[in-house]
């Protein structure tokens, strides 16, 4: 039987799908290994906090800038397509926020349900509190990504009119925010949650416009080495923490430089990645990871909770962290999480289909922004306070309100058009199934 050819939209770059997909296993494995459980009664904590080699591994293994570069590529591609159809910025923000809000709401309910089962089975209350706080930490990406996505129409306009000035302004703001506390000013580092990731997202705009691929390969390599060199200056000369994970909260200029290094290295590797993506096995693997990307990212914490609960129920010990026994047991530990996650990938999409169909109506920009703020506020509360706090119910209610508002849309005219980026992704996934 002749295999049907893969239909790929003309504005889709499979090298972007590749890097987004391969980043997911890195995130899952890192979070799984970071989960330390120790003591009597047990407590959950960051197992790698005292493991010094991790700091230098993160110079290569910290892939969050690549996520935002890929997100910037996808965001400006979607927004430009929407503009050509005559859609509004409010509708773009509505669709993108809804595509984040629905999955994260269900995943948060999944975490709470698992924790409730563990509590009913007699798990220690303080262990559950520390464990629940650790499970909430990956939510930072959802909150920040929702904010950055809502800025895409504005940042795309600035990119079109004054791209260079936009890059330099964002970079200058990042440096200023870093320097103010160092000179006795107020602690304003939280502002870099916006400035750093907007800058890195903007790098994805440059990838979309083929800025970097037009440069000589020797120049790209030189720029990547220079970015890493400036990181060394910041660490050894200015006292920055060499651990890129430590530089996440709040983000610092080191992540900006790492984003630059990664965009140059990605551009160098793009021809090889595109050649790899012409192979059917690679398309199958990347298509599967892309198809279940949101499930993998959001539900790997549920998978960890299920594995921990099963380990406690079976009376299996938790070895002291960083010991030889602990490192050896990380292999079955990670494999168990992957197995549960694979099962969740088969179940969760079916559950997600219970959502009512959204009304295709144009949403005014102020309403779309307000709904996005509600989403970020709800996720942000659980992120900073943990799942097991009195405010969790209110936070989930806030997210549910945002979902209802985004689903209904606004008082504008009916639209016959389909959702934007997700249409492309779902078609690509369907094509992957036919390979």
Model-inferred region functions:
Residues 2-421, 432-435:
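Alpha-helical transmembrane segments and their immediate juxtamembrane cytosolic regions
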């Amino acid at each position: 039987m002749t295999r049907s050819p893969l239909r790929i939209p003309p504005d889709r770059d499979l090298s972007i799908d590749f890097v987004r997909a391969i980043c997911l296993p890195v995130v899952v494995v890192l979070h799984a290994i970071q989960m330390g459980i120790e003591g009597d009664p047990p407590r959950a904590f960051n197992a790698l906090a005292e493991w010094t080699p991790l700091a230098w591994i993160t110079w290569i293994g910290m892939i969050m800038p690549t996520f935002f570069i890929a997100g910037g590529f996808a965001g400006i591609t979607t927004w430009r397509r929407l503009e050509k159809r005559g859609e509004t910025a409010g509708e773009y923000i509505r669709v993108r926020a809804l595509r984040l809000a629905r999955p994260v709401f269900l995943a948060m309910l999944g975490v709470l349900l698992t924790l409730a089962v563990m509590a009913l089975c007699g798990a220690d209350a303080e262990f559950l509190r520390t464990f629940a706080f650790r499970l909430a930490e990956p939510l930072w990406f959802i909150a920040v990504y929702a904010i950055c996505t809502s800025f895409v129409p504005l940042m795309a306009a600035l990119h079109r009119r004054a791209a260079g000035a936009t890059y330099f302004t964002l970079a200058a703001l990042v440096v200023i925010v870093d320097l103010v506390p160092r000179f006795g000013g107020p602690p304003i580092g939280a502002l870099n949650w916006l400035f750093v990731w907007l800058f890195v997202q903007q790098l994805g705009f440059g990838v979309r416009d083929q800025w970097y691929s037009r440069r000589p390969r020797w120049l790209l390599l030189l720029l990547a080495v220079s970015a890493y060199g400036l990181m060394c200056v910041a660490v050894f000369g200015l006292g920055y923490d060499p651990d890129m994970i430590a530089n996440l909260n709040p983000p610092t200029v080191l992540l900006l430089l790492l984003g630059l290094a990664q965009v140059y290295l990605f551009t160098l590797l793009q021809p090889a990645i595109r050649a790899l993506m012409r192979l059917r096995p690679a398309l199958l693997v990347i298509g599967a990871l892309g198809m279940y990307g949101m499930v993998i990212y959001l539900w790997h914490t549920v998978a960890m909770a299920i594995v921990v609960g099963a380990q406690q129920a079976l009376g299996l010990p938790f070895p002291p962290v960083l010991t030889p026994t602990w490192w050896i047991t990380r292999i079955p530990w990670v494999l168990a999480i992957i197995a549960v996650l694979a099962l969740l990938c088969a179940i969760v999409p079916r559950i997600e289909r219970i959502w009512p169909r959204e009304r295709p109506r144009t949403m005014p920009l102020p309403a779309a922004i307000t709904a996005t703020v509600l989403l970020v506020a709800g996720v942000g509360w659980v992120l900073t306070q943990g799942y097991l706090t009195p405010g969790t119910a209110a936070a989930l209610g806030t997210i549910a309100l945002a979902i209802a508002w985004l689903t209904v849309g606004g008082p504008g005219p009916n639209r016959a058009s389909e959702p934007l980026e997700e249409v492309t992704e779902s078609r690509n996934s369907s094509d992957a199934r036919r390979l």
